[in-house]
Design a protein with these regions (language model features):
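Catalytic cores of the polymerase beta-like nucleotidyltransferase superfamily
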Residues: 1-499
């Protein structure tokens, strides 16, 4: 394959390049915008490639922030200076949101979450501070000529994630790069062309994973989210565990590794089962996180049902080792594995973990709600215990979560999670569970077609009740409204009945 030597720079960006050149300054496109263009591959007849339209673009320059602002203003619809102290000015230029940063070096001192920034005047020095060779490729914003001092194009072609220079130094400069390495390996990999870190980069990460403690929750969350939403999320999660990074992101997840399950229901341990569920659910942010957390409560609720080999008495114990029967003193052996209440324990763990990573409250509530309810669909058995219409209405209503006008979670999301969970079940049980799932889904769809079950409420509001009973405000109102709402859900009271 011919090596790409030049990019076709779109008009808005090339005009910026021209403005900077006329003012005596350099302007180079850098980072993801160049990497993505190079990954598209060269044209058939020429070693050139067009930049994709309508995307964000990063650029680097020898101009300092005040000069950048002056040069941007004639071309920008909007201009932002939030990152000015780090040398970055952002602007909306045509279809692009451009971030232009002064050539610089930056380093995070141990224990600090803020980099020490020094401005420079040399492109190659600026590229040398970048994390990986695939991100250390620049293209002249005016001519499109590529500058590649660290052979990033070659590594893109080979599918290699390689640090620029010494991997230990690059990770020390900014420990978030350890998560970024996993993210790039995960998101860039395709079936026909996988990406992999170099052994020395993996070693630097594995030996220094604890450096992540100095990184803010928000920055860790952004990288974790990108890994989790990737089509190769399971590979990324495995790598986070293998390289020792997961303890600094979601440490509770490490507890799922090698936790056995009842073979009749699950043929994989909790960790492997979780990966199957994550890969089986669509890449929607709330659903992916619900899949990731859905069984995280199992390790802390693990119990073994023992049976006495002499008198047959049953007992529940935390250990799989043989024990002594409390009734007759005989020997007990483990027969079954249980995780009673793991959904509620898991919901609490998910809430704490997401709060620790500074997720928005709505996201935290939605995910913990889905985790807490993820066992509900298993209470429905098509062949022996199908629910009444009232029970299905209650299921729909109970699994609905909203804040104001914003819907956070609903029965559709829960059923998608349940369907993915079934995919990770043992083959024989899977067939039975799939039949019940289809039957429940059909009943849910049928009932929702008749009415907006999620919005069913008491036909009488607080004012109606105070007027009818001649009483003032108090707790009695909520109790009575809940009772009336329940009657509506059960079907014994119409949603518009006022009498």
């Amino acid at each position: 394959m011919a090596e790409i030597k030049k990019l076709e720079v779109p008009g808005p960006l090339s005009r910026l390049g021209e403005a900077f050149e006329e003012a005596g300054h350099e302007l180079y496109l850098v980072g993801g915008v160049v990497r993505r263009a190079l990954l598209l591959g060269p044209d058939t007849d020429a070693a050139t490639e067009a930049l994709p339209d309508r995307q964000d673009a990063d650029a680097a320059t020898d101009a300092h922030p005040a000069r950048i602002k002056a040069l941007l203003r004639p071309h920008a619809e909007n201009l932002w200076t939030v990152g000015e102290r780090f040398g970055t000015i952002a602007a909306r230029v045509g279809e692009y949101e451009v971030q232009i940063t002064t050539y610089r070096t930056d380093r995070y001192t141990q224990g600090s979450r803020h980099p020490e920034v020094r401005f420079g005047d040399n492109l190659e020095e600026d590229l040398a501070r970048r994390d990986f060779t695939i991100n250390a490729v620049a293209a002249d914003a005016l001519t499109g000529e590529i500058v590649d001092p660290f052979e990033g194009r070659k590594d893109l072609e080979l599918g290699v994630i390689r640090a620029v220079g010494d991997p230990l130094e690059r990770m020390r400069d900014d420990p978030l790069r350890m998560l970024r390495a996993v993210r790039f390996e995960t998101t860039l990999s395709k079936t026909e062309k996988p990406f992999a870190m170099t052994p020395d980069l993996e070693e630097a990460i594995r030996n220094n994973a604890g450096w992540l403690k100095s990184i803010s929750a928000e920055r860790k969350r952004e990288e974790f989210e990108k890994i989790l939403l990737s089509e190769n999320a399971t590979s990324g999660l495995r790598t986070l565990v293998r390289l020792g990074l997961m303890p600094y992101v979601v440490p509770e997840f490490m507890e799922t590794v090698d936790v056995e399950q009842e073979a009749e229901f699950h043929h994989k341990d909790v960790f492997e089962h979780t990966l199957i569920v994550v890969s089986s659910v669509e890449a929607e942010p709330i659903l992916r996180k619900a899949a990731f957390f859905h069984d995280i409560g199992k390790p802390r609720t693990l119990a073994y049902e023992h049976r006495c080999t002499y008198c047959g008495a049953k007992s529940t114990r935390k250990s799989a080792e043989e024990g002594e029967c409390d009734r007759c003193g005989g020997r007990t052996l483990p027969k079954k594995i249980h995780f009673y209440g793991h959904e509620n324990v898991g919901a609490a763990i998910a809430r704490r973990a997401m709060q620790r990573l500074a997720y928005p409250k709505d996201d935290v509530d939605a995910v913990s709600h889905l985790v807490a309810n993820h066992m509900r669909p298993y209470g429905y058995a098509a062949s022996r215990d199908p629910w009444s219409d009232a029970a299905v209405r209650r299921f729909i209503r109970d699994t609905y979560l909203a804040r104001g006008d914003r819907e956070l979670a609903n029965v559709d999301m829960l059923l998608k999670l349940a369907r993915a969970d079934i995919t990770g079940s043992a083959p024989r049980r899977r067939r039975i569970a799939e039949e019940s799932w289809r039957s429940l889904k059909s009943k849910v769809d049928e009932i929702r077609a008749e009415d907006a079950v999620e919005k069913l409420e008491s036909p009488l509001n607080g004012n109606d009740l105070m007027r009818q009973f001649g009483m003032g405000p108090g707790r009695w109102i909520k109790a009575l409204k809940d009772h009336l709402q329940n009657e509506v859900i059960e079907g014994s009271l119409g949603k518009d009945d006022k009498a």
